[in-house]
Amino acid sequence: FFAAPSSFNDPFDCKFSPVIASVKKLASEIAQRQTLDYEPENVERAILADSAIDANFVKAVDRVMNRHGICCFSRKNEEILMWSHYADSHKGICLGFDVSKDPDFFVFPINVTYQDNYPKIDVSQPAGTNKYVSALLGTKYKKWYYEQEVRVYKEHHQAYHFIPASLVSVTFGCKAEAKIIEEVISVANANIELNHVRFYKTEMDKEAYKLNIVKL
């Protein structure tokens, strides 16, 4: 499912800090978009006098971003915190994909970067460029680094279908119930399009704070 950013568990997700590198450039662009004959100089004065322009820009971008959908993936399947937070306390499953087998579904993947401050978005630059989408969707607080996240962006927040061939593995959590494991494997084996899927299970290491992946 591709969810709207407003539904994410982190309220800081997709936030940014607006800056105006060139008031003249912004004023010129606004004047050109208007049906009335506004002079850029008058628009520039209005911008400088508007103390809420940053807040209004943030609200406008939020509205646009929340029309779209994002699906979040990870480059790792053995991270303890990921299993604790997103897999029903290690009772859930992790799906493994070969993205090359479904390029349409996994189009425009964004590798998330992690830092202390919001990304800066220049209000005076044209909106909607890939650079700004990547900055908004691909920047998170540095404490989330363990997620090693990759995001895929779609036009609408809704469910999308992936090609079955792209699903290559299912890994069960170390606390997954035996009946759940049996049911999932049974369903996959009964579907000719999923006969290639490999099954694994995490096991708690006996000496270190880590998970080992064991083939079933």
Task: Name what the model sees in each region.
Residues 1-216:
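Partner-binding and oligomerization surfaces adjacent to conserved cores of proteins
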